[in-house]
Amino acid sequence: MCEEVVKLAGIKEYKVNKNPDLEDGDLAILLSESKVKMDSLAIKLNTPKQLFDSIKEVSKLTSHELDDDEILVFFNEYKIALKYLKNHENTHVKVKVLSNFLKDIVVNIGFEITDDNYDYVIYPDYLKGNVLNENSRCVEIPSHTFVSKNPFERIETRYGILEKLI
């Protein structure tokens, strides 16, 4: 999932590896929830702002740090990602959220997170069993396994599902 960010940031020589500690490498660029023993740069890719910041941070490792305008060009093909680079206000939608990665997204869209009197339960596909007895409307969001590895496409898919609730 980090490969697209590495490419966009301008890193030409890299190796994709699911187990960086088992291979030779100078630096692992990985998702923030991953842990390795070697030197690493942890990035987050759940929201458009996190994606933007991650591209910027990774580009600092190259001879040409990208400026904001150069990074914004990458967002031009992705209307939803571009729209949500800044947080929105949609607090009329009240949701219960069952995952930390989804909380980032829900806050960005502007929904109010609550454990009482909510309109929807937002959950990742791997927690489907946890919502079987819910009385509220449940909205399943695909986890990393079931969406594109391209972070822009992943944002478009997940946010597209949640935008229907506004």
What label would you give each PLM region?
Residues 3-48, 73, 77-166:
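Binding-cleft/active-site segments that stabilize strongly anionic ligands or cofactors
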